[in-house]
Amino acid sequence: MSTLLDVRNVSKQFTMGGLLSRRVVNAVQDASFSLSTETPEIFTIIGESGSGKTTLARMILGLELPSSGDIQFRGKTVSAKGSRAEQLAFMGNVQPVFQNPFEAFNPLKRIDRYLESTTRRFLKLTQRDDIDGAMDEALQKVGLSLAEVKGRYPHEMSGGQLQRAAIARALIPNPPLLVADEPVSMVDASLRMSIVNLLKSLRDDLGVSIIYITHDLATAYYISNRLIIMQRGRIVEMGDARAVLDNPEHPYSRLLKASVLSTEDAGDGKLATDPAMVKLASDLVARPGTLESRGDGRLVRVY
């Protein structure tokens, strides 16, 4: 079985503070997982703010270098220090979709100009009809068309439309892997499922694998094949998405599920969270533990 992405014992430390108050923050600690080329999947990274999920995504994209460990895409180490040709080839294979579509586009630049520059850069097209055809093909994949976006600026589109345009731009090089960092968190609630269903169709219909980064357990349950749950930089549970979220084993995983508003307490605005569970999950942060396999194929951090 060929490996598309291989994350091996990756850690990332940041030095924070000034000369007299310097401290090291362990943003990601010894993370490992892999994606296969055989079966496209949506692999989800779940965690609250500060869990390390975005830092891990940035390292996969080559925007940050690991402090230790190795990330390989199709057998080659991901590095921000490669030649321009190597970086361009990698960018054509691994494309990002960022959280806020309004920050992904220059407000003074037309959407079709962005799409055109991406088309010229990665597909090396020069003829007007060929460029327009490639842009329209990418837009059709996300439920838009070139006629709908041509001549329009970002502020003239809704958040949902703009995020679709951002995904279309990412699809122009025909990448086998997308890294989507909280792609629905800045989109109106009424439009979120349309973006989630779009990601699902990219996997099912186009064969694109997606690393989906979120704190939203509901969408993770809906679209994920496998997932990891991160707490303070460490993977605490990994496995089949339904198995893990139906019956989470690690205290932090159980806490995440329990913190979702229950139907019984929704009217009172209460969270179904056990204080003892909160304390246990917090106490375990300082203990490294080890990942142990279970009969259903999942890995759970034990202490």
In which residue ranges do the predicted regions lie?
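Conserved ABC ATPase signature
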Residues: 153-157, 161
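A short, surface-exposed alpha-helical micro-motif characterized by mixed small hydrophobic
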Residues: 220-222
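Conserved ABC transporter NBD signature motif
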Residues: 37, 69-80
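Short catalytic/signature loops enriched in Gly
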Residues: 17-19, 24, 240-303
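ABC ATPase NBD coupling module
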Residues: 19-22, 78-95, 113, 121, ...
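ABC ATPase "signature
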Residues: 235-239
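A short, proline-enriched helix->beta-strand linker immediately N-terminal to the Walker B motif
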Residues: 172-176
